Amino acid sequence: MLPWALTGLVQGKAITESLFKDVRRSSTDQKMQLPNRKLISQVSTATTYYVSATGNDRNGGRTTSSAFKTIQRAADLTKPGDTVMIMNGEYKNEPDRGTVLGIKRSGTAKAWIKFQAYPGHSPKIKHNTWSGISLADGVSYIEINGLEVIGNTASVTRAYALSQQYKLSNPLTNGNCILIDGRKRTVHHINILNNKVHNCPGGGIAVVAADYVKADNNTVFNTSWYSPYGNSGISFFLNADYDNNRGYKHFITNNRVYNNRQYIRTLSSKRISDGGGIIVDSSQGGKNGGYKGRTLIANNISYNNGGQGIIAHESNHVDIVNNTVYGNGQSPELSKVQLAAGYSNDVKIYNNIIHGFPGQQVNKNMRNKNVIYDYNLYPKGAVSVVGGIHDVVGDPQFINPSAGDFRLRSKSAAINKGYYWKDVKTDHAGKPRPANKFTIGAYQ
């Protein structure tokens, strides 16, 4: 996503399949201390609301048999510590609304507000508007867990999208699946966990001017196709500091991101420029100056995207560790680079399997400072422009990459050849990574 693309994220009145399924699920259950009566009172009065596609918004919403019909009805009642349990069914936007779920109420550090699938259920948020889920204007301490967000790409033809490429107020070709927008007031402490996000003509998970965002164990595919705003599967744009912490604050981990691509030319450049898997972009000069926190991009699988699999662009303090990128650069207008940093500073790129096309350039070093590539694996025939002395050239021996299975066979050249990265304790499937036997790539 490029700087000029911001206006396309929020417009109008309310503007704002996985091929191989892992069993690991992300969890952020808070272990609460109870030091005083005030906190005891807060915990004891936390409410669980229930939502069902067959419910009624005139119900009380506090039992499965008295569930609300819309998620928004429950969201508008939430207080710190509350949980919204969403049951099976399809939840769609009203014709005059810019989102299905607009989250406006915040939790606290010790009492997050959670929106999650009811156990054993698979609710679907379907929309043809600006976003399926939106969080904006300083919202904080929110968790979105286990939902499926589906856009309207299946009902939009490429011919129609081309006819609308200069009509920027059309949500049918510009809608995002999940939008976090902190440009007015910094949004912070948001967890996006275990969701399936797909078929949105704009971005998949789009994060703008936010801090402390965790995107973990999501599956993001078939997004970014029809918008002229330079979207990608997962994008963190204009990162903004909520505090002065210099450690890890943004986490993009354990996600599966594929088949995101741009078919409509980018507005300003009049060319295909984006449609990649994961991008951290333009964080050197946000609204509070350059972002000072670190971003960890780890254990992701990014493949068959139109643009690059993973890129840090005009961003500082990013660690890209133990990812698998494969077969990206599907758009013929773009290079075949799989993983790169450009115009960035203080970026470490370690332990990644970077698998592109024979004879094609797989990485790039574009006017960077203090960017280190090392302990990465490249297949034979790949053109590595920048590397490290501990790099491995060999066959990763994926089990079945054509089916999206990037686990490693026992003879893989990646096994036990990685660098110990203390903050990456498990792999993409939740398997522990032994300190003395770190394997390159998303799988241990």
Which role fits each region the language model picked out?
Residues 72, 76-80, 92-114, 124-186, ...:
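Extracellular beta-strand-rich solenoid/capping regions of secreted or surface-exposed proteins
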Residues 93, 151, 156, 199, ...:
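Residues in short coils/turns that link rungs of repeat/solenoid architectures in beta-rich domains
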Residues 53-88, 92-93, 412, 429, ...:
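Acidic Gly/Asp/Thr-rich repetitive segments characteristic of extracellular carbohydrate-active
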Residues 23, 29-36, 67, 409-444:
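Surface beta-loop-beta hairpin patches that serve as ligand-binding interfaces in beta-rich domains
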Residues 20-72, 90-91, 119, 397-402:
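Right-handed parallel beta-helix/beta-solenoid
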Residues 103, 151-182, 222-242, 259-287, ...:
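Acidic/polar low-complexity surface segments
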Residues 94-100, 110, 293-405, 429:
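Predominantly extracellular beta-rich ligand-binding scaffolds that present long acidic/polar faces
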